[in-house]
Every structure is written in C-alpha cells, then in structure tokens.
C-alpha cells in the first residue's frame, strides 16, 4: 500500500471493534476499528473521513500480540491484525453513530 489510492480506502477498514473498553471510549468520541496491518495513519484517516463523512482529529494505532490457538496436538496462531483508535471531531459524532448503530 505504498500508493495513496482513494479507490482502495474502503478496503482498509475491516470492522468496528465493540468491546467493553471500546464502548467506554465512545463516550470520549473515540471509535475503535480493525484495519489491515499495512495501513498507515494518513490512509486510515482518509478512509474514515471518506466512509463516514466526518472530521478525524487524531488516529492512534496498535498491533496487538498474536494469540496461540491449539487444535489437537497442533499449535498455531490467530492472524495478525491492527487496531486503530480514531478520535472524531465533537460536531460529527452523531453522523458516525447513525452509521454504526442504526435504530431499528
């Protein structure tokens, strides 16, 4: 992903991460997403701004350690993923909540 191609931006963000910690961080306008491991912060910022039509203030990334997975006598690892914590501008919070959590 060396080139900055706007057509590839939607493929960078895989899914939102909805854990207890991520839910608490949503109250501080911080949203957590799983992204491709090779995605950079500027690419993540552009993808979130393009997908949700919001202003991104800050992007923090983390590569959590791989977890062991055992099947019988064989030991393997779960796939590597990258976590992006995106801070949204206070005025745009309702836009992203409507997309992530539509009312039924």
Curated annotation (Swiss-Prot):
Keyword rRNA-binding: yes
GO CC aspect terms: ribonucleoprotein complex; ribosome
Entry's Gene Ontology molecular function annotations: rRNA binding; structural constituent of ribosome
Origin: domain of life: Bacteria
Gene Ontology BP term (one): translation
Keywords from the named record: Ribonucleoprotein, Ribosomal protein, RNA-binding, rRNA-binding
Function: One of the early assembly proteins it binds 23S rRNA. One of the proteins that surrounds the polypeptide exit tunnel on the outside of the ribosome. Forms the main docking site for trigger factor binding to the ribosome.
Family the UniProt entry places it in: Belongs to the universal ribosomal protein uL23 family.
UniProt xrefs under HAMAP family: Ribosomal_uL23_B
Assembly information from the UniProt record: Part of the 50S ribosomal subunit. Contacts protein L29, and trigger factor when it is bound to the ribosome.
Protein name per UniProt: Large ribosomal subunit protein uL23
The species this protein was found in: Trichormus variabilis (strain ATCC 29413 / PCC 7937) (Anabaena variabilis)
Protein encoded by which gene: rplW
């Amino acid at each position: 992903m060396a080139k900055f191609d706007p057509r590839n931006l939607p493929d960078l963000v895989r899914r939102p991460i909805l854990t207890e910690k991520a839910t608490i961080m949503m109250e501080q306008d911080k949203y957590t997403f799983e992204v491709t491991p090779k995605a950079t912060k500027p690419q993540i910022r552009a993808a979130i701004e393009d997908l949700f039509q919001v202003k991104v203030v800050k992007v923090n990334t983390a590569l959590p350690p791989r977890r062991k997975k055992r099947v019988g006598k064989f030991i393997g690892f779960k796939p590597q993923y990258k976590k992006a914590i995106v801070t949204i501008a206070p005025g745009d919070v309702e836009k992203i909540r409507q997309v992530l959590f539509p009312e039924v």
